[in-house]
Amino acid sequence: MDNRYYRHNRRKYSLKVHIVLVTKYRKQLLQGSIADDVKQKILDIANTRGYEIIAMETDKDHIHFLLSYDATDRVCDIVKIVKQETTYYLWQKYNSVLSKQYWKKKIFWSDGYFACSIGEVSSATIQKYIAVSYTHLRAH
C-alpha cells in the first residue's frame, strides 16, 4: 500500500493519518470485549465509508489507528464520525457498564484527538510504532 496511489476523476493521491483517541477522563475501559468491539466498529465504519484501516491497537485508555482516506474527506470529520458511531454503539451494548463510569452524559471519548499525517514517514514505520507501543504497554 505504501507506494500505491489512488486515482479518482482527475485526482491522484495517497493520504494516510495516524489518529489517537483517548477515553474521557482516561478511564481504563478499552479492555476485553469493549476493546474488541471498538476495533470492530471502527473497521465497520471504515468499510462503509471507504477508508482503509492499515493498523490499529488499543491500550486501556486510548486507541491508535493508521487510516488511509479519500482526498474529499477531512480528518476532523473522520474523527467526528468514528467518535459518534462508536460511542452510540458502545452505549447500546454496554449501558450498564458505562453508566457506572459516566453518569451525567452518554460519552466515551475525550473532546480532543491526536492526528498526524505521515507524508514524511513511511506507513511501515507507523505500523511498527503502533505494534511496538502496544507490545511494550501490555508488558507493563
Where are these regions (language model features)?
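Basic nucleic-acid-binding interfaces
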Residues: 1-134
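Conserved small/polar residues in nucleotide/adenosyl-binding loops
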Residues: 135-140
